[in-house]
């Protein structure tokens, strides 16, 4: 059979649903840029902050090289998930 469940995903798109969500991130300045499905860019202080946002807000994103980053905000788009 072709589909044995071990195929790796083709895209780099990620969303994190691990529980509990990371609540505290290290105070490390290692900026990462991501792009969401609306082609909006976000610049986060570090990868942990991206994962925290992804987990808490259901934020789906793709990592983008810094030189291609057109980020206008560094805030997590919390409003994407209605609680």
UniProtKB/Swiss-Prot annotation:
Taxonomic superkingdom: Eukaryota
Thermal dependence, as annotated: Thermostable. No decrease in activity was observed after heating for 1 hour at up to 95 degrees Celsius.
Modified residues (Phosphoserine): 8, 11, 15
GO molecular function terms noted in the UniProt entry: serine-type endopeptidase inhibitor activity
Protein keywords: Disulfide bond, Phosphoprotein, Protease inhibitor, Serine protease inhibitor
Disulfide bonds: 21-55, 25-48, 33-69, 53-76
pH dependence: No decrease in activity observed after incubating at pH 2.5, pH 7.4 and at pH 11.0 for 1 hour to overnight.
The name this protein goes by in its record: Greglin
Organism: Schistocerca gregaria (Desert locust)
Role, per record: Serine protease inhibitor. Inhibits porcine pancreatic elastase with a Ki of 58.3 nM, human neutrophil elastase with a Ki of 3.6 nM, cathepsin G with a Ki of 153.5 nM, chymotrypsin with a Ki of 26.7 nM and subtilisin with a Ki of 0.68 nM. Does not inhibit neutrophil protease 3 or pancreatic trypsin.
